[in-house]
Amino acid sequence: MLYECIKESAMKFQTRLLHGKSVQSYEAGATVPAISQCNAYSYESSEQLEKIFQNRAPGFAYTRIGNPTVDAFERRVNELEGGMGAIACSSGMSAVTLSLLNILQSGDEVIAGSGLFGGTLDLLHDLEAFGIIVKFIPRVEKALIEPLISEKTKVVFGEIIGNPGLN
């Protein structure tokens, strides 16, 4: 790691973001991570690759799942946010889908504003086929949300600037 001699607690935010604990050291002394253009990775054995696919060992199996470039980006975002981890998604819809599918299960409820991106509206309607109840409200406002909250409510979903009416 670059700047190993500096204690991380002494680093200011910008320095920590560039060189903090979550940021990997780079090959050949590079000051930024290389852009990985590899689409597949080889390993000594199929057992080693199987462990990577099952998330029982670190490594990369296929670039759409992850690669060193995306890993460096996720580590920096995590450092920026001070989180437990980060996942980079290829689109906003993949981020929304991953978020909802990791929180919800059959029998859960969602309260959602009706002024959402069309793909998000479609996803929410599709979730109903899996036993997830979606309650739509015209605007994301506390007065409209509170009466709908139940023990089964897991998500209140809205957009900062709703489509198409900007409400």
Give the positions of each predicted feature:
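Active-site core of PLP-dependent enzymes with the aminotransferase class I/II
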Residues: 162-167
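A glycine-rich helix N-cap at a beta->alpha junction
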Residues: 127, 131-140
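Short acidic loop-to-helix transition motifs that present clustered carboxylates
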Residues: 93-96, 139-144
